[in-house]
Design a protein with these regions (language model features):
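Carbohydrate-binding surface patches
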Residues: 84-97
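Feature of Fe-S/electron-transfer and energy-metabolism proteins
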Residues: 11-17, 81-87, 186, 192
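Short small-residue beta-strand/loop micro-motif enriched in glycine and branched aliphatics
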Residues: 43-49, 90-93, 153
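Short beta-strand micro-motifs enriched in acidic
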Residues: 23-27, 84-86, 333-335
Length: 367
């Protein structure tokens, strides 16, 4: 258990979801196209005309968008629309299985003009997206007002769906790390730099490590855009096969590490936590942000029981109202490492060794 339970963080229960994936299906019996979420535990698409968890701008667009899709010749070849909205822009990514006709494209351009949106096309996988109007597409940005950082992202990039609570979460993580101007920090699973760039405004050096080479390249570009290139470095590494040697290498590269932030996907960070449990080169503070309480509990147990880390505090953030999901945050600092017993010669827990039992039998009287 943590020594302190942090106060939970709540945001608005409504209008919070800034990313969503809408399914599209023509329903002949209704003579129309449905655009919306799937019904609970069903392949059916809800007949949505509004949505209270989407920003009002997006909710108000559902009916006009549905009418637009219904008017397109390729409506049967457009199974999905992914959306991303910020204060500045609304991007709609159309999963198109066929090339658009000139008439369809003209309708999209008129809709884009009338409603102030940016259409993107996705002919294949998520990396294949491109804007319909590259010269005029508005850039999507996450803002961290306390540090002045802006993180630019593409509509299919992973970002937190709740932008306001993401900003609060980043601020809380910075404060829990107890950063100093001389701090050397590693941000594991750094993505586009959601934590890395704000961390760099309060530290001497931040190393962001991420599995995707493309995200690392764009995180570097983000650091340059925010005038933080001289305080940041980025590496593309597979963090699921991280070893103690890898930890030693980054420790030596930075000349020591004062703080660590871990923000893994649902799978957690077992290999990374194993190295932090085994090493004698330990940072002064570790903050672990998690979207999966089960893997956080597993990794925390590894750090505490095998590495001697102390769980100072932990808390939750209601990042996803009206769902069963929760975002958690935990703070650790080094404690005394447990003693390791390599070999027990005479007595084992729960009974005697085989050698001791044999000696006892040899001393029993013969009858």
């Amino acid at each position: 258990r943590p020594e302190q339970v942090l106060a939970p963080i709540y945001g608005s229960a409504w209008r919070y979801r800034h990313r969503a994936r809408l399914s599209v299906r023509e329903v002949a019996k209704k003579g129309t196209v449905l655009v919306g979420f799937h019904e609970k535990r069903s392949s059916f698409i809800a007949d949505m005309k509004s949505c209270e968890i989407l920003p009002k701008r997006v909710s108000d667009l559902l009916v006009p968008l549905r009418e637009l899709i219904n008017s397109l010749s390729l409506r049967k070849k457009l199974p999905q629309i992914e959306l991303a909205v910020t204060d500045e822009a609304l991007a709609l990514v159309l999963r198109v299985l066929e090339k658009l006709t000139a008439d369809d494209e003209a309708k999209l351009r008129q809709f884009q003009k009338d409603y102030g949106v940016d259409f993107w096309y996705q002919p294949k996988g998520p990396d294949s997206i491109y804007p319909m109007d590259p010269e005029n597409a508005t850039r999507l940005k996450l803002h961290h007002r306390e540090t002045g950082v802006e993180v630019v992202f593409r509509p299919t990039d992973f970002t937190q769906v709740n932008h306001r609570l993401n900003e609060v979460m980043v601020t809380r993580a910075l404060r829990l790390l107890h950063l100093e101007p001389s701090s050397k920090v590693i941000d594991f699973f750094c993505g586009l730099g959601n934590f890395t760039l704000p961390l760099a405004t309060r530290s001497a050096k931040v190393l962001g490590i991420e599995g995707s080479t493309e995200l690392v390249d764009r995180a570097r570009a983000g650091a340059k855009d925010n005038n933080l290139a001289d305080k940041t470095e980025f590496e593309a590494r597979n963090l699921f096969d991280w070893t103690l040697d890898d930890w030693d290498a980054v420790w030596n590269k930075l000349g020591g590490v004062d703080r660590v932030l871990i923000d893994p996907p649902r799978e957690g960070a077992m290999a990374l936590c194993r190295s932090l449990a085994d090493t004698d080169k330990r940072p002064a503070r570790l903050v672990y942000v998690s979207c999966n309480p089960a893997t956080l509990a597993r990794d925390a147990a590894l750090l505490v029981r095998e590495g001697g880390w102390k769980l100072l505090s932990a808390g939750v953030m209601n990042m996803f109202p009206h769902t069963a999901h929760v975002e958690s945050i935990a703070v650790f600092e080094p404690g005394p490492k447990p003693e390791k017993i390599d070999e027990i010669d005479e007595i084992e827990i729960g009974g005697m060794t085989e050698e001791a039992e044999q000696e006892t039998r040899s001393e029993e009287p013969k009858i």
